[in-house]
């Protein structure tokens, strides 16, 4: 199983957009807002564009995006 450590913000954005159907909905400084329409409504999250995103921050990003870690790990 791939480790979630050491991912950059840019890598996270690419996975969320290219593999999980999110789209960039805005940018503010070093943060990118992503959103996705689902049958339950709109889901959004914010990803900091840092060279390495800490594991706790990544878990928070995934929680807001309503994606479990196992689903995200499939695309690493």
Positions of predicted regions on the chain:
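Basic nucleic-acid-binding interfaces
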Residues: 1-76
């Amino acid at each position: 199983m791939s480790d979630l450590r050491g991912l950059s913000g840019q890598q996270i954005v690419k996975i969320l957009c290219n593999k999980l159907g999110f789209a960039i909905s805005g940018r503010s400084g070093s943060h990118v807002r992503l959103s996705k329409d689902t049958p339950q409504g709109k889901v959004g999250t914010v990803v900091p564009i840092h060279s390495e995103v800490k594991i706790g921050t990544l878990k928070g990003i995934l929680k807001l995006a309503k994606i479990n870690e196992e689903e995200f790990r499939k695309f690493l």
